[in-house]
Curated annotation (Swiss-Prot):
Enzyme class label: transferase
Name of the protein described by the UniProt record: Cyclin-dependent kinase F-4
Its EC number(s): 2.7.11.22, 2.7.11.23
Naturally occurring in which organism (per UniProt): Oryza sativa subsp. japonica
Gene: CDKF-4
Gene3D superfamilies linked: Phosphorylase Kinase, domain 1, Transferase(Phosphotransferase) domain 1
Residues annotated with Phosphoserine modification: S151
Length: 459
């Protein structure tokens, strides 16, 4: 940790504290998460749920884990730094955010959730404190409670802050899925648009009461599984007639109310998937670009993969482990290679030509500066060597060429007649790039009628 200078503590939680720090080597500002418990082996560190999940995800709207360092049995996460979290922004606001701002943020979050859910993970702890903001970019953070969809239940009962906790979790269901993230996003969206929590319960029972007051009590048609869960834990839903969300959010558009209503459905199966939410009319005008396409087209900046993880061996010497590739997409360098027009074949060709020791064909001196030369268009960039084929049409007078190459020395006097195509008697050798003369020139155009012209090549 000597490479980092701690500047200021910016957060403190149950499992650790977060500091703003500077990398002394390159001046980069990073976030350092210092875990409170001690870890006595690096293998134990690498088995942490947060490390395992972040190593598998690479998305512009998911915070990057740069390094994992274990020093003196203390574990540090080196992560990319963001200016603040969503809770801090809401706390300092006087009036609610505009729908345009909420639309921009939520669209990014749902893209990250769609990416995450499709790869078999769900967050389980979505709340404004875990949504980090820098300017108009927002990213998911704190994957300490993230879990794989394929994990074997029962799951832990405590998940997320109570105000954003899904009803199936409140009723202590041990089986749930990514739908809990959808419920949390509905509550967060409503809070962004009103600056008031949608379900501010003081306990689990009070939280369910707050939910019933807004969307009504569940019944056999809306959520039969929920009634069974309540019966199991000897809980009875209060009988409240519902669907009063529009009354709570009077200054919000009908599209936003409709989306929040679908996200905050009692039945998890009736909540839309993250990928489906991106197609909702509330996000009309926003363009969804899948991460795989985005990295190729360069629509959004691609986030770099993890730099590595670092531990301390028994002898006190630091050891670095690779965190692996975070994405199956092609590296950014490949995308820039395509955009600049440098094909892989061209680069290989350049390398092959550099290995040889070719005799250079020097440009002939033209007496009247009217010699026409057919050539392959050259590019002044690596991977595109200039390939020339020396074939010229003479003027009426004789053109003298100096220092003619070995190729042209083999040619004798050549004459061109009207409507007649004349080719040199000996076949021209292949070019060094592996292309023949005919490949470069394609079809040879006939020379228009003219009086007999003669050209001599002089060594």
């Amino acid at each position: 940790m000597d490479r980092f200078k701690m500047i200021k503590e910016v957060g403190d939680g149950t499992f650790g504290s977060v500091w703003r720090a500077i990398n002394k080597q390159n001046g980069e500002v990073v976030a350092v998460k210092k875990m409170k418990r001690k870890y006595y082996s690096f293998e134990e560190c690498m088995s942490l749920r947060e490390v395992k999940s972040l190593r598998r995800m690479n998305h512009p709207n998911i915070v990057k884990l740069k390094e994992v360092i274990r020093e003196n049995d203390i574990l540090y996460f080196i992560m990319e730094y963001m200016e603040c979290n969503l809770y801090q922004l809401m706390k300092d606001r006087v009036k609610p955010f505009s729908e345009a701002e909420v639309r921009n943020w939520c669209f990014q979050i749902f893209q990250a959730l769609a990416y995450m859910h499709q790869r078999g993970y769900f967050h389980r702890d979505l709340k404004p404190e875990n949504l980090l903001v820098s300017k108009d970019v927002i990213k998911l953070a704190d994957f300490g409670l993230a879990r794989e969809v394929t994990s074997v239940p029962p799951y832990t009962e405590y998940v997320s802050t109570r105000w954003y906790r899904a009803p199936e979790v409140l009723l202590q269901s041990s089986i749930y899925d990514s739908a809990v993230d959808m419920w949390a996003m509905g509550a967060i969206m409503a809070e962004l648009l009103t600056l008031h929590p949608l379900f501010p319960g003081t306990s689990e029972a009070d939280e369910i009461l707050k939910i019933c007051n807004v969307i009504g009590s569940p019944d056999e048609q809306s959520w039969p599984q929920g009634l069974s869960l309540a019966e199991t834990m000897k809980f009875q839903f209060p009988q409240v007639s519902g669907n009063q969300l529009a009354e709570v959010m009077t200054s919000v558009s009908s599209e936003a109310v409709d989306l929040i209503s679908s996200l905050c459905s009692w039945d998890p199966c009736k909540r839309p998937k993250a990928a489906e939410v991106l197609q909702h009319t509330f996000f009309q005008g926003c363009t969804f670009v899948p991460p795989t396409v985005r990295s190729k087209a360069g629509v959004l900046p691609k986030t770099p993969p993890c730099v590595g993880v670092k531990g301390v061996s028994e002898h006190g010497m630091p050891r670095r482990y690779s965190t692996g590739t975070l994405s199956t997409t092609k590296p950014h360098s490949n995308a820039s290679l395509k955009s600049s027009g440098l094909s892989k074949t061209g680069v290989q060709r350049k390398l092959q030509m550099d290995r040889q020791a070719p005799q250079k064909i020097k440009k002939p001196t033209e007496s009247n500066n009217k010699l026409t030369t057919n050539r392959v268009p050259a590019r002044n960039s690596p991977g595109h060597p200039v390939l020339r084929h020396s074939r010229s049409l003479p003027e009426t007078g004789r053109a003298t060429m100096h220092k003619v190459s070995t190729l042209t020395e083999r040619l004798t006097h050549m004459s061109v007649t009207s409507r007649t195509r004349t080719t040199p008697k000996p076949a021209a050798p292949l070019l060094k790039a592996g292309l023949g003369k005919s490949d470069l020139l394609g079809k040879t155009d006939e020379i228009p009628p003219a009086k007999r012209l003669t050209r001599k090549l002089v060594s």
